[in-house]
């Protein structure tokens, strides 16, 4: 019996360490939440909190017959390598983006009621790994300084859909593409109510829940970086509504703040936000689960304090916005140095979609 137990422990050890891991090139620190795409634009995988690639990743890339894999993370340069190079590499290194951000000048805060954040958003939804919907545009967020409630108003947008992709049935459509809502955990005040912290170094803290690492707070070039896993396969969220069964087993958020203080961060100094969600869905128990994933990003362009809000019509968050509405190509030049274009494979897939005008 002891021999069997030792064998199980040994095999578990070997199997866990056979997983590839993604590291920061200069510091050899593991990178969580790296998205991995095929050369056809399919989202194949997302690394976990410790930077490990999932154990079934190699089976996935073999089934897709991709020649290359592309690694995407908002804090690092996009990297593409061949399948041969991937299999011959023990670890994958990504190079950090070196970015000097300009200070955002804001108006006097006396007597104001709202904070307005104007920025560029983009959102893509995957159906069984393939791009299905795409929205991007310019949006104003209005945040009440008294209640914290947030309203959003889209000024311009583009809308694309791949109509060849089918969802659960002709009657059921699951869509979370569109303007994202800022998560409550983007503020220090809220995050400390649920999580604890452990100091890793002078520039890094790990974020813990039930003594398990769920993310990190890092300072870098006078900015603060937040990375947090809210839901994963180990702590998924299951829901049922109108006969629909869903499981949220991937929900990660990342953010950058104009602050190097690990205590002083909230929406007033937010300059970048990203989230990725993954759902398993089915209409009834006889069906197989369908896989839906969506990424949302927001890049701050302007910040202003207001006494009142002029707009009176607002958008619903996580709702596909159509048709396209714009006077000029707002997407050509984004005035936020954190902005990186999508990998070419994903851009090509979006360009093959039909724009809804």
Positions of PLM-derived features:
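Short beta-strand/loop motifs in extracellular/secreted proteins, especially
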Residues: 31-35, 67
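Bacterial Sec-dependent N-terminal signal peptides
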Residues: 1-22
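Surface-exposed, low-complexity/disordered segments
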Residues: 89-357
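Short amphipathic beta-strand segments in non-cytosolic proteins
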Residues: 34-46, 106-110
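Short, acidic Ser/Thr/Gly-rich low-complexity loop/linker segments typical of extracellular
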Residues: 42-56
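A short, solvent-exposed loop/turn motif at the edges and junctions
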Residues: 68-81
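Structural motif
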Residues: 19-32
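Short Pro-Gly-centered beta-turn/loop motif in secreted/extracellular proteins
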Residues: 54-66
């Amino acid at each position: 019996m002891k021999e069997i137990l030792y064998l199980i422990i040994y095999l578990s050890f070997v199997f866990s360490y056979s997983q590839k891991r993604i590291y920061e090139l200069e510091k050899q620190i593991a990178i969580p939440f790296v998205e991995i795409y095929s050369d056809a634009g399919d989202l194949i995988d997302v690394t976990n909190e410790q930077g490990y690639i999932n154990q079934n990743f190699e089976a996935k890339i073999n089934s897709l017959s991709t020649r290359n894999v592309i690694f995407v993370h908002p804090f690092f340069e996009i990297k593409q390598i061949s399948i041969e190079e991937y299999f011959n590499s023990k670890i994958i290194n990504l190079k950090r983006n070196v970015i000097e951000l300009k200070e955002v000048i804001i108006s006097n805060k006396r007597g104001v009621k709202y904070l307005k954040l104007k920025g560029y958003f983009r959102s893509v939804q995957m159906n069984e790994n393939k791009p299905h919907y795409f929205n991007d545009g310019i949006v104003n967020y209005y945040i009440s300084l008294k209640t914290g409630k947030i309203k959003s108003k889209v000024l311009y947008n583009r809308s694309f859909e791949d109509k060849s992709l089918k969802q659960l049935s002709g009657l059921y459509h699951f869509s979370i593409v569109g303007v994202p809502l800022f998560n409550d955990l983007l503020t220090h005040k809220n995050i400390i109510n649920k999580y604890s912290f452990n100091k890793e170094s002078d520039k890094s803290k790990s974020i813990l829940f039930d003594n398990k690492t769920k993310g990190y707070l890092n300072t870098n070039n006078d900015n603060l970086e937040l990375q947090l896993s809210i839901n994963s396969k180990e702590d998924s969220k299951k829901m049922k509504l109108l006969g629909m069964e869903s499981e949220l087993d991937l929900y990660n958020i990342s953010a950058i703040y104009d602050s190097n203080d690990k205590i002083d961060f909230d929406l007033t100094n937010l300059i970048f936000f990203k989230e990725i969600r993954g759902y398993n869905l089915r209409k009834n128990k006889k069906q197989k689960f369908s896989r839906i994933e969506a990424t949302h990003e927001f890049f701050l362009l302007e910040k202003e304090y207001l006494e009142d809000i002029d707009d009176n019509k607002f958008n619903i968050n996580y709702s596909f916005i159509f048709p396209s509405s714009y006077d000029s190509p707002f997407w050509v030049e984004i005035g936020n140095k954190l902005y990186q274009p999508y990998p070419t494979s994903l851009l090509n897939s979006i360009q093959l979609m039909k724009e809804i005008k």
